[in-house]
Amino acid sequence: MRHVARLTIIIVCVAIAAMWVYAFGFSPRESINKIYDEEWASQAESRCAEAREQRADLSDLSTFNINDATALAKRADIIERANSSLKSMIDDIEQILVSNDKGRALVPLWLADYRTYLDDRDDYVDLLRSGNFNRFSETQVEGVPISERIGKFAKDNEIRACIPPFDLVT
């Protein structure tokens, strides 16, 4: 009986070790988000870089009083212009043709997430215009901020200029 128990324990340990060797050494490393469309990625990266430059021109690093409605309105104006640049970017990316089925399935989902993120940014503009200041709050998807999902897709497809801006993080 002891021999059977010992043999069972050895088999279980070897199986667990083999599973970890496979997981860390041999399992595929393909990202679920990777669409393998270099032409689409190149065009998207270029358009996102252009939008990032437009937003950089809007940057205002001055401090502002969170109790000053005029200062909040000024900040809202800047964010609104940045949002406009992002919306135009997303509209342009939507027009770029994707060459494969996986991309045709995933890119619209990514763009929909980006539009949700932009809706959150628009809500923040409305909050500032109302004279109230609070931290930027974004939609959570399965407990993850939507900007992280958007950024993960951008990183996995090597379109880092398309990572959402962190200009509202306080």
Give the residues covered by each predicted segment.
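Short, Lys/Arg-rich N-terminal segment immediately upstream of the first membrane anchor
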Residues: 1-4
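C-terminal region of N-terminal signal peptides and the immediate post-cleavage residues
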Residues: 18-40
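Amphipathic, charged alpha-helical scaffolds that flank and support histidine-based chemistry
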Residues: 128-132
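Mixed-charge, polar/low-complexity N-terminal
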Residues: 6, 30, 98-100
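Hydrophobic membrane-insertion alpha-helices, especially the h-region
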Residues: 6-24
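Alpha-helical segments in soluble extracytoplasmic regions
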Residues: 39-125, 135-170
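Generic detection of intrinsically disordered/low-complexity segments and helix-coil linkers/edges
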Residues: 14-18, 34, 104, 156
